[in-house]
């Protein structure tokens, strides 16, 4: 690549699959045999091969799905959700978790439940490969988008449940206020940006536990009101 071709984003990511320079040094591949690992040119072969190498190095498991959309039984304890709480497949089966089509949950290894759009949206059982994608980009939305696109390219179906426009039934300002009030109380909820991620949910769990509330880890208007 010429200096003029080596363009990147404001953060320094470059090439077809947006590699940081240090990532390029570790994982770039000359897959087409030209003698150069060119992730910038019109032919994306090297960029895709380099990305595959990165995912492999991060622990990608061939043949394992990134996630499976599932259905939870009524009165399911939402405190069991969150990607930091993986369980064995047989344990989820005992708790009544099924696939979204009401089928038996297959054993793809330990999995964790996530509710990216709140209790009214889709529920996913995520596996090791989901976490590998997040090492490439930490946003759940990114990992879900990439994972679902790969499913569709492989001929698999759409996500069955819809994504509500207003997850958790709270406005952005209300979610920001929730994060800020948790921070003010000493429960580290992270930057009050209105995006409730794993750090925010961990803070909610800790706060709920301290108050003797049912531990869900989920944001709500009632939780915000309890913080004053």
Show the residue positions of the predicted features:
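Catalytic glycan-binding domains that act on GlcNAc-containing polysaccharides
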Residues: 1-108, 121-124, 132-150, 155-160, ...
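Surface-exposed charge patches
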Residues: 22, 53, 90, 177-180, ...
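Short glycine/proline-rich, acidic loop/turn segments that cap or connect secondary-structure elements
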Residues: 109-124, 172-182
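Short acidic, glycine/serine/threonine-rich helix-capping segments at coil-helix boundaries
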Residues: 170-175, 183-227
């Amino acid at each position: 690549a010429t200096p003029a071709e080596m363009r990147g984003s404001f953060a320094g990511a470059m090439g077809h699959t947006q590699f940081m320079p240090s990532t390029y040094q570790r994982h770039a591949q000359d897959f087409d045999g030209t003698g150069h690992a060119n992730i910038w040119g019109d032919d994306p072969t090297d960029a895709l091969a380099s990305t595959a190498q990165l995912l492999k190095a991060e622990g990608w498991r061939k043949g394992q799905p990134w996630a499976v959309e599932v259905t939870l039984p009524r009165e399911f304890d939402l405190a069991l959700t969150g990607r930091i709480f993986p369980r064995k497949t047989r344990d989820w089966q005992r708790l009544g978790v099924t696939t979204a089509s009401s089928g038996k949950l297959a054993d793809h290894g330990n999995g964790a439940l996530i509710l990216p759009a709140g209790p009214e949206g889709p529920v996913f059982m995520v596996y090791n490969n989901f976490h590998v994608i997040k090492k490439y980009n930490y946003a759940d939305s990114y990992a879900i988008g990439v994972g679902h696109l790969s499913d569709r390219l492989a001929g698999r179906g759409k996500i069955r449940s819809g994504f509500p426009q207003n997850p958790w039934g709270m406005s952005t300002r209300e979610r920001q206020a929730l994060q800020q009030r948790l921070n003010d109380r000493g429960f580290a909820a992270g930057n009050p940006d209105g995006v409730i991620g794993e750090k925010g949910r961990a803070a909610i769990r800790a706060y709920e536990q301290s108050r003797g509330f049912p531990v869900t880890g989920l944001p709500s208007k009632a939780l915000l009101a309890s913080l004053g």
